[in-house]
Each structure stands twice: as C-alpha cells, then as structure tokens.
C-alpha cells in the first residue's frame, strides 16, 4: 500500500542497484551529489510501465505566464509573441501550446504501449 507515500521516498529506500532498476518506477543513478540517494523516482519509466504518475504541478507556474499578457492594450498584445487578442482582453497563447504538447506526449506514450 503506497497511499500517502511519495514515489521518490519509496525509491530512496532501495539501496541496491539491481533492486532499484527492477522496480517499475525507479532508476539507479551512479553519480549523485553528497547526501543524495542513488535510487530515484523515474516518471518516464513509470509511464512506460503503465504506472499512474501523479503530477505535482503548482498553480503558480501557469499564473505567471498568464499574467504577462493580462491588462495589455490591443496593439501591445498583438506584438507580444506569446500573447493574443481575444474579444476585449489580451490572453497568453503559450498555455494552449503547452496543453497541445502535453496531449501529443500522452498520445505518443499511449501509441508506444500498443506496439
């Protein structure tokens, strides 16, 4: 039962390379900084093995990109590379690109599972 335990902490408990690499969500790192564990959580490996990976993303990251376009006048908005004028407001168009990129990554991972 892994409820309440982070995948990273579960991997950090493993101290032997073969056991770490056998785990569905962990990978062994030969060179680490002093005080760091060799066995670490690997989200790419976890996704490939079909393990559900919870995304730890803070809302602050998306707010920062949205705010850079907020409140700009139409002319200024249209000149900015990641902004677009929509209706009566200036909006961040990079969020849409990020969502499309995330969707294509998920689609590619799913297709890889089928073959």
UniProtKB/Swiss-Prot annotation:
Keyword set includes Iron: no
Q: Which residues are glycosylated?
A: 42
| A GO-annotated cellular component | side of membrane
Determine if Oxidoreductase is one of this entry's keywords: no
Task: Report the membrane topology from the UniProt record.
Answer: Lipid-anchor; GPI-anchor
Positions where lipid (GPI-anchor amidated aspartate) attaches? 92
Question: Which residue ranges make up the pro-region?
Answer: 93-115
Primary site of residence: membrane
Q: Where in the cell is it found?
A: Cell membrane
Keyword list, A-Z: Cell membrane, Glycoprotein, GPI-anchor, Lipoprotein, Membrane, Trypanosomiasis
Function noted in UniProt: VSG forms a coat on the surface of the parasite. The trypanosome evades the immune response of the host by expressing a series of antigenically distinct VSGs from an estimated 1000 VSG genes.
Please identify the protein, giving its name as recorded: Variant surface glycoprotein ANTAT 1.8
Which organism encodes this protein? Trypanosoma brucei brucei
């Amino acid at each position: 039962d892994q409820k309440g335990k982070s995948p990273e902490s579960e991997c950090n408990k493993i101290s032997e390379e073969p056991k770490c690499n056998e785990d569905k969500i962990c990978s062994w790192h030969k060179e680490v900084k002093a005080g760091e564990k060799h066995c670490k959580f690997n989200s790419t490996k976890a996704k490939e093995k079909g393990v559900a990976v919870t995304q730890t993303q803070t809302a602050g990251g998306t707010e920062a990109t949205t705010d850079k376009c907020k409140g700009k006048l139409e002319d200024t908005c249209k000149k900015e590379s990641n902004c677009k004028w929509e209706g009566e407001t200036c909006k961040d168009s990079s969020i849409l690109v990020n969502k499309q990129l995330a969707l294509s990554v998920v689609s590619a991972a799913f297709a890889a599972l089928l073959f």
